[in-house]
């Protein structure tokens, strides 16, 4: 890897930090990739070894199919699924939100948000419940794409629903999958497809549109990242044409930078005053950007470094302690770089047991968890050199990003939701 450096020292005096999406949620996992969006828990200490019979606190079967990650608030675990409806005709699905007891795995409640036959197909490795839910500790939000966004209280009472989004037409019928993001009084909903693409900011209490911003982008499966930079909240989004940032309050585009590859999926992360955005389908690109620029920042001092080596496709990069971890394309090949300089710390390295990846890496308790589609999860030290700790399996495939909370690790597999604990 040969990063291109552009006045890297200048960014050290600046700061960009994740905007804490919810009040006092560091002991929970309230959003896809956690409360800061960097896929790191600073408090969790989950197990590093398990099997189908070891360190499984409980497991529960989930009907239907979905790859949305579980989210956890105190004693409640939320997960979504698209469940075939028996006797209703071919292709009819029930779009459901499940709430489980964190201690026992018992079902607390199950709500059907919608029942419909999807208007278009999906990729064979995708489904129709790929977006992760999110919660602010008072409400939980389930997003089923073209079927709508649904808001419930924590007892399962529906508070509002928004079902008037225009139907998505995704690239090659690959299906939908971007997750919503909570930030303050807003819930952000990306709507990138082959039609008119839009980023929505909705009132989280009512579902009313606060603002929407047109995006000249084709299908993108990334999830918005909200950061604070120089006193202003920004919404950072990947895109095939440009990586972009928007003013959280108004939706105004603040800056953009080209270089991305086709049909981006990976979401942005942030650390050390920088934002990192990349993609890895039919090409390779990863860039480190200072979020203080204006307009098109390509070729300016706001681009600190870029690389075109071994960058991620489906799985998003993970940021921990100033180190950026990412897989090459959809493979299990791992690279770790110093976020400030772009210098390779180790990799690309082929990991034992992990050959293909959709789930994003996570970090907790001084370890990094790397999930293969086969269900193998390799655990390494969260350190500047590679040290494999273990490789573990639960006997079924995993495409959803795991969620570490407390002393537990929650994993949504093809058929079951698992709670792991020593």
Task: Name the predicted role of every residue range.
Residues 1-5:
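Positively charged n-region of N-terminal signal peptides that target proteins for export
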Residues 7-18:
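Bacterial N-terminal signal peptides
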Residues 21-422:
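Noncatalytic, solvent-exposed loop/strand surfaces
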């Amino acid at each position: 890897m040969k990063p291109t450096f552009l006045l890297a020292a200048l960014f050290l005096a600046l700061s960009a930090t994740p905007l804490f999406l919810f009040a006092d949620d560091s002991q929970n996992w309230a959003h896809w990739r956690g409360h800061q969006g960097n896929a790191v828990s600073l408090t969790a200490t989950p197990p590093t070894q398990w099997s189908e019979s070891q360190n499984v606190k409980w497991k529960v079967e989930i009907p239907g199919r979905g790859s949305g990650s579980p989210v956890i608030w105190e004693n409640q675990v939320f997960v979504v699924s698209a469940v075939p409806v028996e006797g209703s005709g071919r292709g009819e699905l029930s779009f459901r939100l499940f709430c489980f007891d964190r201690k026992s795995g018992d079902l607390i409640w199950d709500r059907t948000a919608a029942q419909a036959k999807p208007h278009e197909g999906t990729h064979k490795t995708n489904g129709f419940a790929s977006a992760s839910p999110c919660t602010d500790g008072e409400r939980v939000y389930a997003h089923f794409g073209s079927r709508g966004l649904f808001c419930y209280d924590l007892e399962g009472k529906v508070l509002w629903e928004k079902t008037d989004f225009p139907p998505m037409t995704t690239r090659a019928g690959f299906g939908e999958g971007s997750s919503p993001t909570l930030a303050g009084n807003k819930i952000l909903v990306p709507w990138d497809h082959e039609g008119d693409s839009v980023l929505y900011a909705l009132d989280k209490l009512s579902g009313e549109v606060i603002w929407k911003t047109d995006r000249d982008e084709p299908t993108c499966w990334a999830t918005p990242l909200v950061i604070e930079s120089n006193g202003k909240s920004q919404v950072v989004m990947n895109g095939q044409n440009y990586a972009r940032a928007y003013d959280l309050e108004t939706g105004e585009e603040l800056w953009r930078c080209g270089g991305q590859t086709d049909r981006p999926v990976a979401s942005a992360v942030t650390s050390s005053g920088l934002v990192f955005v990349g993609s890895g389908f039919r090409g390779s690109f990863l860039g480190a950007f200072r979020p203080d620029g204006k307009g098109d920042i390509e070729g300016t001092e706001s681009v600190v470094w870029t690389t075109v080596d071994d960058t991620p496709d489906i799985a998003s990069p993970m940021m921990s302690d100033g180190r950026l971890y990412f897989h090459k394309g959809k493979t299990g090949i791992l690279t770790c770089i110093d976020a400030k300089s772009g210098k390779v710390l180790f990799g690309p390295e082929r990991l034992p047991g992990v050959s293909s990846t959709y789930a994003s890496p996570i970090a907790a308790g001084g370890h990094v968890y790397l999930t293969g589609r086969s269900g193998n999860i390799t655990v390494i030290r969260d350190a500047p050199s590679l040290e494999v700790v273990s490789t573990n399996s639960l006997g079924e495939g995993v495409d959803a990003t795991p969620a570490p909370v407390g002393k537990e690790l929650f994993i949504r597999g093809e058929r079951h939701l698992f709670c792991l604990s020593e």
